[in-house]
């Protein structure tokens, strides 16, 4: 089973030419991890571009996410089969529940047990969740048992560090993928990150990514520009001191970028 590469290509809000620019250039530069979702409405294009790239499917770690409309009894697996068809593949590396069911409209056990069944049937190699609170993560572990939930994908960056969620995941061996790791570009203007970057000869964005990577997280920034895609990859080589790591931790201010009206409290 392929291990998830620590740096991936996020595809949220990318379609048409921007998606083409991001994926084809990214794969050419050496990215081997693509993150998409049913609600992004770009799975078919992602599949086409993966095929066009010439990179063998088995060399790409592919994640998609099941949308909340597909949680009801008997719906999760057919929705993943549609995703697989669009993506032009017969398996996913990771299938995630995109958000917990709004207001618990569908009981968690209903959709998580279907997701586990999708794994048992070979539709996906690993399963996980996204945007779950600590209470919801506890419930998920109780439903499926220890070790079943392999990943939690959640918004994390220096301005929103989600420490309680991170601690819970670490204690339960749940790997973390940080989405929006640059806070929609807000981190680029942070004086502390710029100052640390100058010290290392790198950008504030690279410092933000390096800070997350140093904590053992996977990051999935999105970019359509070749120079930014290459710079994000180069963040893998940035080594921050323990003092710098601690300084960056002081930037926490609960600044959430992804906050739809159905998000859990």
Features from the language model and the residues they span:
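N-terminal binding-site loop/beta-alpha segment at the start of enzyme catalytic domains
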Residues: 1-60, 114, 183, 264-265
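Active-site mouth loops of central-metabolism enzymes
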Residues: 6-17, 65-74, 103-105
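Short, acidic/polar
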Residues: 14-27, 72-87, 108-110, 135-138, ...
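Residues at the N-termini of beta-strands
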Residues: 33, 91-94, 125-126, 151
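Short, well-ordered amphipathic alpha-helices
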Residues: 44-51, 80-84, 115, 137-141
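A short, structured active-site edge motif that brings together acidic residues
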Residues: 57-70, 91-100, 155-156
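CE4/NodB-like, metal-dependent polysaccharide N-deacetylase domain
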Residues: 76-97, 117-121, 143
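Beta/alpha (TIM)-barrel catalytic core signal, keyed to glycine-rich beta->alpha loops juxtaposed to Asp/Glu
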Residues: 100-265
């Amino acid at each position: 089973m392929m291990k998830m590469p620590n740096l991936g290509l996020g595809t949220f809000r990318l379609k048409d030419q921007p998606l083409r620019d991001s994926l084809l250039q990214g794969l050419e530069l050496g990215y081997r991890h693509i993150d998409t979702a049913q609600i992004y409405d770009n799975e078919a294009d992602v599949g086409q571009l993966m095929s066009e790239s010439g990179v063998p499917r088995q060399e790409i770690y592919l994640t998609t996410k099941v949308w909340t409309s597909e949680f009801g009894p008997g719906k999760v697996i057919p929705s993943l089969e549609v995703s697989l068809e669009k993506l032009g593949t017969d398996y996913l590396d990771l299938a995630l529940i995109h958000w917990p069911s709004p207001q618990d409209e569908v009981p968690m056990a209903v959709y998580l047990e279907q997701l586990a069944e999708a794994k048992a049937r070979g539709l996906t190699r690993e399963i996980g969740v996204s945007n779950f609170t600590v209470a919801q993560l506890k419930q998920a572990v109780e439903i499926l048992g220890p070790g079943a939930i392999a990943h939690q994908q959640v918004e994390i960056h220096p301005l929103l560090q989600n420490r309680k969620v991170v601690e819970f995941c670490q204690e339960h061996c749940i790997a973390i993928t940080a989405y929006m790791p640059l806070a929609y570009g807000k981190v680029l203007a942070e004086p502390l990150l710029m100052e640390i970057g100058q010290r290392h000869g790198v950008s504030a964005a690279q410092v933000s990514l390096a800070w997350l990577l140093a904590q053992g997280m996977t990051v999935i920034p999105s970019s359509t520009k070749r120079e930014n895609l290459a710079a994000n990859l180069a963040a893998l080589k940035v080594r921050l001191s323990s003092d710098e790591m601690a300084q960056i931790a002081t930037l926490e201010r609960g600044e959430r970028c992804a906050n739809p009206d159905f998000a859990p409290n």
